[in-house]
Structure formats: structure tokens, C-alpha cells
């Protein structure tokens, strides 16, 4: 039986313990309690806990790894593929559009703490048993090159509420993305999501298979904002052109997180949650040090 690995990274903003955001609902089974006893039920959950490989399974895995490594890509081609990775992903999205990957509708069921729901007093006792699920990870994005913004402007209050207003908002922030984001750190207090009280960043958003399940849920949470980025410009364009994309609550931008010299379209220290879904496994180990 194949072992299903689970790798999730959620970085919570430091210094906000008195005002924690948590979801009001939980996964069907809490982390650590999904024990597979009946092999026929292997597909009932997205993952299983405490799985142990038999000697036969480990031997089979080593055999597969050896077979996979029998033919290696030439070093010069490795360098080329790494250097032009975004180009190849652009070609991929040009061919497949948003039809290749399925929406991750399971994401919020497995990780309800992503959602910005205030903790209710009557739920505190019940939530205490879930403390082992939650982490207070150190902000991995402390090197973001974006100055602290002294004065946040409520840009959305002026432009939301009509299709014309949303178009203007999207246009304004598209200009911000193309000009300020490329030239360097922001020189103005205006930035996407400046009026939000809860902010999520998804790294490696692709065609939006995590973005839109989250964004659809955030529709009833106007104080929340979702940032998403990808180093493939074709992927970002697919997200922006999607019918569910709302510039008043989401900002998609092109970014390579392995390049710590690139600025972000928002200031330091404002993120509550950072998602990297199937991202680290696609990056060369030597480059993960810059994330």
C-alpha cells in the first residue's frame, strides 16, 4: 500500500496571540487520529496517520527510486530547465489552461484554521483539544523587501459596490503590479488589501485551484484578503481572467519566491497565513534556502 505523505506549511503572523482567528468547524477526523485498519477504506480520507512501511514496501520503493535514477538529465540541461522553469510552465498553462488540475475543495476541510473566523467564547473549551493541530510557525517571509506603510488608505471603500468600481480597482492595482512591483519597494501607502484585517498569501497559485475554493468561502468575509503569486505569468493571467476573481478581495501577481531580492506588493508583517501547496517539492533543494 502506498504511503500518503502530508506536507503543509502555514505561517501565522507573530504577536497576535490575543486575537487569534480560527475556524468554527473541523476536519472529519483530527490530525493524528486517522488510523487505517481496513485496506478497503483507503480512499475514505485524503491521508492516513502513523503509517508504517513493511520491509517489502520499502524494498519496492527503493527499487522504484533506483529505476527512476537510472537515466539522468545532462548537467547543462538541468541548468537550462532550472533557469527557464517559468518559461516551461507558461507553455504548460498555454496548452492546458485551467483544465489540468482539479480545484482543491478539500483544502478547507483539512485545514479549517485557514479561515478567518473569530473565536467564539462558547467554543474555547471545545477548541482547546485542537491545540495540537495548530502551529505558531516563525514568519518565513521576514526578508520581504517592502517598507512599512505609515498610512493605510481605504481604496476599496471608494471603488467597490459596482462592476465599474471593481474594474477601476483592478486597473489601479494592475498598474501597481506592473510599475511599482517591478521597479522596487512601494512609495505610497496604497496597496492591495490595505483595509483588510485578515490576509492570506498563497505561493505557487498556478491556475487558481486553491485560490478559488478559498475566495468563494471568503465572499462572506469582506474583512479578509487573499494574495496569490506564481512565477509563471501565464498562470497569473488565468487567475485574473477567471469569472470568480474579485479584485476587491484578491490580488494575483507574478513573483519568484526564490529570489529574495524581489519586492512584494504589500508591506512587511501583515500576513496571517502563508500557503505553499505542493511548492517545496518542485524547487531545487539548493534554492529552498531563499524562501
Swiss-Prot record:
Residues 141-187 are annotated as: Disordered. Signal peptide: none annotated. Residues 1-21 form a transit peptide. S-adenosyl-L-methionine binds at residues 89, 93, 204, 230, 256. It catalyses: cytidine(32) in tRNA(Ser) + S-adenosyl-L-methionine = N(3)-methylcytidine(32) in tRNA(Ser) + S-adenosyl-L-homocysteine + H(+); cytidine(32) in tRNA(Thr) + S-adenosyl-L-methionine = N(3)-methylcytidine(32) in tRNA(Thr) + S-adenosyl-L-homocysteine + H(+); a cytidine in mRNA + S-adenosyl-L-methionine = an N(3)-methylcytidine in mRNA + S-adenosyl-L-homocysteine + H(+). One of its GO terms (molecular function) is mRNA methyltransferase activity. It is found in: Mitochondrion. There is a cross-link at residue 80 (Glycyl lysine isopeptide (Lys-Gly) (interchain with G-Cter in SUMO)). Its main location: mitochondrion. Its EC number is 2.1.1.-. It comes from the Eukaryota. GO terms for cellular component: mitochondrial matrix; mitochondrion. One of its GO terms (biological process) is mitochondrial tRNA modification. The keyword Methyltransferase applies. Keywords: Isopeptide bond, Methyltransferase, Mitochondrion, S-adenosyl-L-methionine, Transferase, Transit peptide, tRNA processing, Ubl conjugation. Belongs to the methyltransferase superfamily. METL family. Interacts with EP300. This is tRNA N(3)-cytidine methyltransferase METTL8, mitochondrial. The lineage of its organism: Eukaryota, Metazoa, Chordata, Craniata, Vertebrata.
Amino acid at each position: 500500500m502506498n504511503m500518503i505523505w502530508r506536507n503543509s506549511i502555514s505561517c501565522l503572523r507573530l504577536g497576535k496571540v490575543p486575537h487569534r482567528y480560527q475556524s468554527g468547524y473541523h476536519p472529519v477526523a483530527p490530525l493524528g487520529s486517522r488510523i487505517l485498519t481496513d485496506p478497503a477504506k483507503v480512499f475514505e480520507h485524503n491521508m492516513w496517520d502513523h503509517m508504517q512501511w513493511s520491509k517489502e514496501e520499502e524494498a519496492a520503493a527503493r527499487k522504484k527510486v533506483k529505476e527512476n535514477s537510472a537515466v539522468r538529465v545532462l548537467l547543462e540541461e538541468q541548468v537550462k530547465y532550472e533557469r527557464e522553469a517559468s518559461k516551461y510552465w507558461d507553455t504548460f498553462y498555454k496548452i492546458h489552461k485551467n483544465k489540468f488540475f482539479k480545484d482543491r475543495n478539500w483544502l478547507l476541510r483539512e485545514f479549517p484554521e485557514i479561515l478567518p473566523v473569530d473565536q467564539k467564547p462558547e467554543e474555547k473549551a471545545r477548541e482547546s483539544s485542537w491545540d495540537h493541530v495548530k502551529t505558531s510557525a516563525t514568519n518565513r517571509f521576514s526578508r520581504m523587501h517592502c517598507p512599512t506603510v505609515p498610512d493605510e488608505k481605504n481604496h476599496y471603500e471608494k471603488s467597490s459596490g459596482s462592476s465599474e468600481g471593481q474594474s477601476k480597482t483592478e486597473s489601479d492595482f494592475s498598474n501597481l503590479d506592473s510599475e511599482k512591483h517591478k521597479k522596487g519597494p512601494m512609495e505610497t501607502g496604497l496597496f492591495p488589501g490595505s483595509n483588510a484585517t485578515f490576509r492570506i498569501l498563497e505561493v505557487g497559485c498556478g491556475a487558481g485551484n486553491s485560490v478559488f475554493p478559498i475566495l468563494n468561502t471568503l465572499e462572506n468575509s469582506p474583512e479578509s484578503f487573499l494574495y496569490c503569486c506564481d512565477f509563471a505569468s501565464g498562470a497569473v493571467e488565468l487567475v485574473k481572467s477567471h469569472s470568480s476573481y474579485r479584485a476587491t478581495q484578491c490580488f494575483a501577481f507574478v513573483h519568484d519566491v526564490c529570489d529574495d531580492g524581489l519586492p512584494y506588493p504589500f508591506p512587511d508583517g501583515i500576513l496571517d497565513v502563508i500557503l505553499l501547496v505542493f511548492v517545496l517539492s518542485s524547487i531545487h533543494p539548493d534554492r529552498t534556502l531563499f524562501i
